């Protein structure tokens, strides 16, 4: 199913595992729990990766939309 808007894509991904790339070069991989109109997201069972390598595991993370690429 194709999405016309970014929020539609996020809504379709709710409850699924996603990767979020951050401006600082890190990637967060986790299950999308919630989001808002500013693209702030809440992820569960998060893994933080740097250059593809696992750095650490984080339980739940709130990610500000302005830090996401």
Describe each PLM feature range:
Residues 1-69:
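Conserved RNA-binding domains used in RNP assembly and mRNA/RNA metabolism
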């Amino acid at each position: 199913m194709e999405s016309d808007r970014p929020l539609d894509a996020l809504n379709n991904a709710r409850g699924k595992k996603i990767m979020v790339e951050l401006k600082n070069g890190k990637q967060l991989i986790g299950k999308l729990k919630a989001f808002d109109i500013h693209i702030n997201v809440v992820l569960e069972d998060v893994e933080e990766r740097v250059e593809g390598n696992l750095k650490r595991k984080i339980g739940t993370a709130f990610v500000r939309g302005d830090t996401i690429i």
